[in-house]
Amino acid sequence: MQLLGNRNGVFPRRLATQDYFIQDPRYLQCYADMFCRFIDLYKAEGLPITKVMYQNEAYSYTPYPGCPWTAEGAQRFNNDYLAPTLRKHHPEVELWFGTINTNRLDYVERTLDNEQLQSNIVGIGTQWECRDNLPQLRKRYPKLRLMMSESECGNGAMDWKAGEHTFFLLSDNLGNGVDEY
């Protein structure tokens, strides 16, 4: 897999053609149940969870261990397992879709155009390359809120230039309709 060089403005270069999360109902329900278990455990420590997203960077096809999902797998898990389980055990917790870290708008739309999914989520969590899609997402899904779910840490310099970049990201995201960070 080529990881360096020109990406032709697209991230990731390749999308997963299969779900890396095992699509057996037992595993899917167990994963949904674990969300509720973590919500319970955090609440017991005085840390209420108000919103969840099913997977960080679910569209990164990486050489290191990750968990890419197909559009169909993401819809299946969120619609058939996570949303109903949250409604039953934690109706106070919002379900957001994300985090979306790809600028492959065609793929994002293929996932989010599912009406059942739209009715199950409150908003869309975006980060990194997905920032390129914010105007289109805002227009296509006006009832869904947008969240900047992660900031770009770059190379970790933590210097003034990195601070300026983070300020730019916040400004750009807010200017494109993001109302959560």
Predicted regions and their residues:
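Substrate-binding cleft and catalytic face of glycoside hydrolase catalytic domains
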Residues: 1-109
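Alpha-helical structural signal in soluble globular domains
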Residues: 41, 45, 80-89, 110-120, ...
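Alpha-helical scaffolding within the catalytic cores
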Residues: 36-38, 79-81, 101-114, 130-136, ...
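Detector for Asparagine
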Residues: 6-8, 56, 78-79, 101-103, ...
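Short flexible/disordered coil segments
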Residues: 59-76, 106-125, 154-168
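Aromatic- and acid-rich polysaccharide-binding/catalytic face
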Residues: 44-56, 93, 98, 109-132, ...
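Catalytic-core region of carbohydrate-active enzymes that cleave or remodel glycosidic bonds
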Residues: 123-181
